[in-house]
UniProtKB/Swiss-Prot annotation:
Keyword flag Nucleus: no
Protein name: Anti-sigma F factor
Protein keywords: ATP-binding, Kinase, Nucleotide-binding, Serine/threonine-protein kinase, Sporulation, Transferase
Matches recorded under NCBIfam families: spIIAB
SUPFAM superfamilies assigned to the protein according to its UniProt record, in alphabetical order: ATPase domain of HSP90 chaperone/DNA topoisomerase II/histidine kinase
Summary of the function given for this chain in its UniProt record: Binds to sigma F and blocks its ability to form an RNA polymerase holoenzyme (E-sigma F). Phosphorylates SpoIIAA on a serine residue. This phosphorylation may enable SpoIIAA to act as an anti-anti-sigma factor that counteracts SpoIIAB and thus releases sigma F from inhibition.
Domain of life of the source: Bacteria
Gene3D superfamilies registered for this protein in UniProt: Histidine kinase-like ATPase, C-terminal domain
EC number(s) per entry: 2.7.11.1
UniProt keyword annotation of Nucleotide-binding present: yes
Record PANTHER family: ANTI-SIGMA-F FACTOR RSBW, ANTI-SIGMA-F FACTOR RSBW-RELATED
Biological process per Gene Ontology, one example term: negative regulation of sporulation resulting in formation of a cellular spore
Amino acid sequence: MYENKMNLEFVSKSQNEAFARVAVAAFIAQLDPTIDEISDVKTAVSEAVTNSIIHGYENKEDGIIKIEVEICDGEVTIEITDNGKGIEDIPKVMEPLYTSRPDLERSGMGFTVMETFMDGLLVESEKEKGTRVRMKKKFNILS
């Protein structure tokens, strides 16, 4: 059971990445996070949305990215979903420095950043059907 929930949907334009991270940060502000915690969440959301745009939709601006954020007992769950091309080998793409787009000079650190800044990361994907990234972060609630 969640205490609060938000859903957001937008087209896969790179300009919307900043909007997504600010919207999620504004929503979790109700937990009174530290500046570092907000920065961690914004960075993780930015990486996931950027992956959807660049890899899932291959920079095509007609895809849809969905974000669902739930707060329950001081824990935030963020799901970012696309209906893009999917990931064939999830363990491979989660290796640090691996990139499927060296032509774009991508660093291959997106999933590593998400794992580092969040308390939990789960990636589910099906080829040609899309990808869902689920991230969790626990916040210390002051009474």
